């Protein structure tokens, strides 16, 4: 295991991760070239990174997210997009009258293994909201206008912070 790292690929064809050229960190300042790639299961690989020759150097890369250069990716097909294109889009909801009102802005697209999740920073501040990225929850995406329409599930809409009663932390009789 000297100098090898575990790598999870989120590319459309997981094995193609090494064909996209050097990967970079989030800042774009450090680049990493894959010297070899060995499939473990699904989209998880053991990779040897050029210049990483010791266990300590490999451990220094733990939890580091690596990115493919946008220029290395093929252009999306008609009606397709990259998930990264969603970050920064305004998210709107329809009010009771059908008028679209700003809900927040997409801060990130997450995936913990059960499907893509949109992290939305609310327009009124507060904690971000997580919404499943499904056609039912996100029925309309307009990349040109830089906006999406979201229909939050009832569970999300019902989440209100608990109110503290004026009497403090003691239960009332």
Swiss-Prot record:
Please state what the protein is called: Ribosome maturation factor RimM
A GO term, aspect molecular function: ribosome binding
What cellular-component terms does GO give this entry? cytoplasm; ribosome
Q: In its keyword annotation, does this UniProt entry include rRNA processing?
A: yes
Q: Name one GO biological process term.
A: rRNA processing
A Pfam family matched in the record? PRC_RimM
Entry comment, domain topic: The PRC barrel domain binds ribosomal protein uS19.
Grouped into one coarse class, the protein's main location is: cytoplasm
**Record's subcellular location:** Cytoplasm
What's the stated role of this polypeptide?
Answer: An accessory protein needed during the final step in the assembly of 30S ribosomal subunit, possibly for assembly of the head region. Essential for efficient processing of 16S rRNA. May be needed both before and after RbfA during the maturation of 16S rRNA. It has affinity for free ribosomal 30S subunits but not for 70S ribosomes.
């Amino acid at each position: 295991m000297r100098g090898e790292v575990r790598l999870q690929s989120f590319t459309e064809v997981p094995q193609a991760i090494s064909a996209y050229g050097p990967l970079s960190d989030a800042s774009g300042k450090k680049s990493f070239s894959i010297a070899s790639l060995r499939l473990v299961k699904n989209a998880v690989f053991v990779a040897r990174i050029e210049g990483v020759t010791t266990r300590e150097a490999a451990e220094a890369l733990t939890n580091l997210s690596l990115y493919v250069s946008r220029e290395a990716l093929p252009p999306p097909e008609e009606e397709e997009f990259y998930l990264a294109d969603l970050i920064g889009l305004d998210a709107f909801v329809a009010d009771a009258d059908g008028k679209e009102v700003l809900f927040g802005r997409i801060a990130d697209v997450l995936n913990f293994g059960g499907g893509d999740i949109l992290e939305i920073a609310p327009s009124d501040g507060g904690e971000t909201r997580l919404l499943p990225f499904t056609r039912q929850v996100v029925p309309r995406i307009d990349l040109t206008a830089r906006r999406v329409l979201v229909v939050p599930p009832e569970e999300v809409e019902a989440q209100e912070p608990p109110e503290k009663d004026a009497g403090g932390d003691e239960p009332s009789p």
